[in-house]
């Protein structure tokens, strides 16, 4: 019986997200959104990221789609509440960009970065979201995005 319980625990653990911390924005990195005509998506894993102390990188840029941009921003605002470290920029009470760090139980952190690409528009239609995992520090990643 103990073996069965252990096997179920292992299978369940393997079936969960590969990311160190699960976030609401994960729902945005699904095939039907990433292949939408208003979305440009990038995913990178492996040796290319080693020099940046990252193990995973994925991003989506939404252009000219208020519904998708608003949904992404709503998820980001929810996730920001879970961040252990954050930096945000606002203008007239409007969130323009955010950089968030999420600590995990293992030696990797998860990082979420976003910015509005049309900050002066009345309606948010363009947004970029970058989701990363690795051992880089908050300051190292901020330097990469300057």
Residues covered by each model-derived region:
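Bacterial Sec-dependent N-terminal signal peptides
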Residues: 1-25
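Polybasic/polar functional segments that serve as interface/processing modules
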Residues: 19-109, 117-123, 137-139, 143-146
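Short, well-ordered, aromatic-rich surface patches in folded extracellular/luminal domains
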Residues: 133-135
């Amino acid at each position: 019986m103990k073996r069965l319980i252990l096997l179920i625990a292992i299978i369940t653990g393997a079936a969960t997200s590969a990311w160190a911390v699960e976030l609401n924005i994960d729902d945005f990195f699904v095939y039907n959104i990433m292949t939408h005509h208003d979305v440009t998506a990038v995913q990178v894993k492996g040796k290319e990221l080693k020099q940046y102390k990252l193990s995973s990188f994925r991003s989506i840029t939404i252009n000219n789609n208020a519904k998708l941009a608003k949904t992404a921003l709503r998820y980001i605002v929810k996730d920001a509440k879970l961040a252990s470290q954050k930096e945000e920029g606002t203008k007239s009470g409007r969130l323009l960009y955010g950089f968030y760090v999420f600590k995990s139980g293992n030696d990797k952190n998860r990082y979420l970065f976003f910015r509005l690409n049309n900050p002066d528009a009345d309606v948010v239609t363009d947004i970029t979201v970058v989701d990363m995992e690795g051992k880089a520090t908050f300051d190292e990643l901020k330097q990469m995005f300057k």
